[in-house]
A protein has these predicted regions:
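A generic structural motif
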Residues: 124-130
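Structural alpha-beta junctions
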Residues: 64, 116-123
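Leucine-rich repeat
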Residues: 1-25, 37-112, 130-163
Length: 163
């Protein structure tokens, strides 16, 4: 059964647990989603027990009308994608709000992944409310800076030293 839900915006004071398989179920149930915000301003010092990965983010972006996404993801590993998944592109998404999403060095891999699958992306703000105080915010600031640089010069050329 599918529904015509176009916008989901949930902001609560506690972390929300969600995994990639549940993202698949959401996309199947709500294929008309245009905007998906699930605690995009999360400011806790600990992530939920389970988070969608970059693969889950990509699956969410399959909704043909999706243009805004904000949620906490686990970006510590670049996922292995199926052939079909590796072809997914969403050109409508320009901003991706990642809250206090876990991420590790080298962040260039995350920036490459995001720009490969979201070629119109111009910004990836981390948690804007306490930038610098959250464990991952400074790494997301680097990803955001790399994406802005790539957009400005039309190139994905970075070295590990850029980090």
């Amino acid at each position: 059964m599918t529904f015509n839900l176009r916008k989901l915006d949930i902001n609560i004071k506690n972390p929300i647990t969600l995994n990639d398989e549940e993202i698949v179920q959401l996309v199947q149930a709500w294929p008309e989603l245009e905007s998906f915000y699930l605690n995009p301003f999360a400011a806790w010092d600990y992530p939920p027990l389970q988070l969608p990965t970059l693969r889950g983010l990509l699956l969410l972006a399959q909704c043909p009308r999706m243009h805004d996404i904000g949620l906490c993801i686990d970006a510590r590993n670049i996922p292995s994608l199926s052939e079909d998944e590796s072809l997914i592109r969403n050109t409508a998404i320009t901003n991706l709000m990642v809250a206090n999403s876990p991420i590790e060095r080298p962040v260039t891999r995350v920036a490459h992944f995001l720009l490969e699958h979201f070629p119109s992306l111009v910004a990836v703000p981390g948690c804007p409310c306490i930038v610098g105080q959250m464990p991952y915010s400074w790494l997301w600031m680097k990803v955001d800076r790399m994406i802005k640089q790539a957009v400005g010069r039309g190139s994905l050329e970075w070295s590990e030293e850029t980090e």
